[in-house]
From Swiss-Prot:
The gene is LIP1. This is Lipoyl synthase, mitochondrial. It comes from Ostreococcus lucimarinus (strain CCE9901). Residues 31-41 have a biased composition (Basic and acidic residues). It is an enzyme of class 2 (transferase). InterPro entries: Aldolase_TIM, Elp3/MiaA/NifB-like_rSAM, LIAS_N, Lipoyl_synth, Lipoyl_synth_mt, rSAM.
Amino acid sequence: MRAVLELTRRRARNARFARARAVVGARARAADAQELRDDSKGGSSVDKATSTAAEARETAHTLEGFREALRHGPGFDDFVRGDVAYSVPAPKSLKDKTTRKPAWLKREVPGGERYTEIKSKLRELKLATVCEEAKCPNLGECWGGGDGKTATATIMIMGDTCTRGCRFCAVKTAKAPPPLDKDEPANVSKAIAAWGLDYVVLTSVDRDDIEDQGAGHFRETVQRLKASCDVLVEALTPDFRGEKHLVELVATSGLDVFAHNVETVPELQRDVRDRRANWDQSIEVLKHAKKSGAKITKTSIMLGLGETHEQVVNALKLLREADVDVVTFGQYMRPTKKHLAVVEYVTPEAFKRYQEIAEEMGFLYVASGAMVRSSYKAGEFFLANVIKQRKAKEAAAAN
């Protein structure tokens, strides 16, 4: 009699488990079906709504089903006896927080004769570009140039390994990277002269392991470039730990644009950047560069990290107070699953609105769009014209 009762209880438990699993499966299938229907509609105006709504719907359905399955699932005694084979798969939303990319973020695979030429020369001279290291989606477009466009490249000097570990960045990190290549300034100037580029961006990893943090190396590279060819040079620098004499060393090197990125709004600095970097320090770097003689200062902000509209507007006000001339906005793109997840894919309409707000504040130039990066070629085309016009006026005044 006891055996019959135990068998009846076991069958009842298994029936409950089966019903719970069916609930999870049915809700997951319903979410998938709805997502497919949403995808079939297409159109950029609904892409963001589709990606966020589908994610929220899936989270609600799978989490609810998961909790229900656990409520009706086996107890501790069941597992101790070992007579029940049961499992509840974790909901997808708990395992993968990746937000689907909307249609406006798609880019063609880079290629073409100019692209191949530049890539080959980089390998030959053992040079690194942030375009490749940071997996920039605009690589093919920027390296192309031609047809009246400004051909640009962003060369990353001082190695491909950084001493810092910002949570958004794909560049390799180490406490003690390899020593600086003393031939690098000469190789960079040789490569740029051979390519015939109009505008070059020099950037670098952070080198906290070096006494001057690479400021002298940066300065030498700029000076060699300006001496070897007629090219406009933008220096996108690290913060040099806020040491003003090092900032000044680069700012007075003969560059045309001094750039340093604040990366995100003040409120998110600690979550996004390495602990040795912060908003106030970056603002002081930009201020001192202008004070030292840099005629154009520039910075960049990533969007989609969880910032609010009010925080972005406030950041713009602070940048104008620091006399920053150029600001760019771009969509944060998660380089790997080890990096910060994307909180939001900002719509083209929102990017346009931020551009309008910044322009109303008096910035010299604003580039704002999902695929815009701090060294984006459209901005360089504008800056190239601004710089050339200023130089022409200065020459005319001197005569």
